[in-house]
Amino acid sequence: MYSQNIYVIRKGDMVIRPAFDDDDQRNGSEIIRFDKTRIQNPFKVQKIIERSCKFYGNTYLGKKAETNRITGISSKPPILLTPLFPTYFFPTHSDRQNENIWLNMHYIESIKELKNRKCKVTFINNESIILHVSYHSLWHQYNNSIFYYYMVDKQSRMISKNPDQPIDYNKATLNVFEALTRYSLFED
C-alpha cells in the first residue's frame, strides 16, 4: 500500500523505518502494522514522527523534553505520542541519523542478538525484522521505553496517593492528562 500524504502514527503501528528502492537508494519510509500490512510513504521517518507529534498535540522537541522531565533520559529518548492507545516509540539511532528506525515497545515479543552487531526483533504477531544495531544498544533503548512507560503510569496512579483510584474526582480541577493516561490502558 502506498500513501502520498504525510502519515500520522496510529494504533497498530509497530515500526517506522526508512524504505529503499530497487537500486538501494532511500525512498521515503515504510510503516509496518500489527495486521501485517506495510505502508510505503514518500516522507522521511523523522518527518512522520514530527508530524505525528503535532497531530497529537505537541512538538517533537516538546515530547523529548517531556520524556527528559519525567525520566531524566536525554540521549535517544523514547516518546509517548498519545496516552489514548499504546504509542510508546523508541529510536534505534540518533534522530539526526537517516538510518534511524522507530519501534513501538508494546508490540515487541523478543530481541535476539545476532553476529556482526545486528539484532532480530520479533513482534507479537510473529513478524520479525533484522536491525543493524548492537544488541546492547537496542536492549538499552527498549528498557528506556519500558522505564518511561512505568514512570508515566506511576505518576498517574500516585497523584491521588491511591493506586486503586488514581484520579481524585473531588478536586476542583481535573487534569486531563491524568484521565487520559489512566484510560489509555483499556483495549477495545
Predicted regions and their residues:
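Eukaryotic intrinsically disordered, low-complexity regulatory linkers and tails enriched in Ser/Thr/Pro
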Residues: 1-102, 109-188
